[in-house]
Amino acid sequence: MMDVSDTYILPVVGYRVWVLREGKVFSYAVDNFWIPKRANVAQCGGYEHVKFWGPHKIQSGPKLIPHASYSAPLAECGCGFYAFRTLPYLMEWLEHREESNIVVGEVYLWGKIVDCQYGYRAQYAYPKRFYSNSYEYNYAYNNSTVALREFNVPVEPMPETVGQPEFVYEP
């Protein structure tokens, strides 16, 4: 795990979850919606701390340090677009969640990227692919599917073989 962020011109691919609400695609942990057909740009919210959930308990995340939005993400801060390095890591993270209307997928990350233990935090992000096992997402046309299709990326079935890695928490 690096303590510094690097700038990437070519995208890194990660895995993340979104929420479908009000006919839009929202971030899971932060109340902002993703804009179709253009890069989504990270900004620091200046919160005291973020919450992230391990497989068994809620833990405090990194402190957010207010700074200029153009410098997001800072390695010392908790801002940026989050993505897991692997789909199995994401699936384990989701294991204890019961929210409805979630969508799992791949995301392109580029610009300033902070390498974290299980994934990345990035300056820019855009969906690469949405996964769904649901007939509704794949074939029906309603507010949810229209919201996904506006991104002009594939909506595909979830890969059938997704191993479940064990998270290892560092004290």
Predicted regions and their residues:
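Extended catalytic/binding region for NAD+/ADP-ribose chemistry, centered on the ART fold
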Residues: 72-94
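Conserved NAD+-utilizing ADP-ribose enzyme module
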Residues: 1-61, 79, 91-171
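Short, flexible, solvent-exposed loop/turn segments with mixed acidic/basic and small polar residues
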Residues: 67-73, 118
